[in-house]
């Protein structure tokens, strides 16, 4: 059956569009849940913080939700693409499980790290890899949907600077959470370009959480 694919970000969208999965519908969400005020999300609104974007930015999800509702009305199965290491798409999965927990539809999920443990997000996969990953889809049971929905409810109304994934669990932290690790890496490297510092930190951090399971 043709499925409606739910993805995060334009990178995954472009790659999926070039794959054999093109015959399936694609709904792209691009709002960053991990640093947003989630308290207004019942109205399909998100506020991104001034601390990061220099001004408060209000985002509307009504367009994406409308497409999702239309897909469900047309009896299409829903497939969410995510990873246990990608906070952006993982929070989207939690939100959708909460939104759909009382809806009559089949909900599937694929995790990129189940295809390759070093693949931290569907966004880093090629067309043929996405096609292979689709074969690993897992239909969520009602119990699983409720469990994911519960996780969403646990964080939805809490105050936090940003959400991250550690050991495959959502953790709510402050903006200075990584300060000590970044400063230690900077001391080790000495004079270094910011882009290299960020790249090395992200690589080291991914290796750390990937090997601590």
Where are the predicted features?
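Short helix-coil junctions and helix-kink-helix linkers
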Residues: 196-211
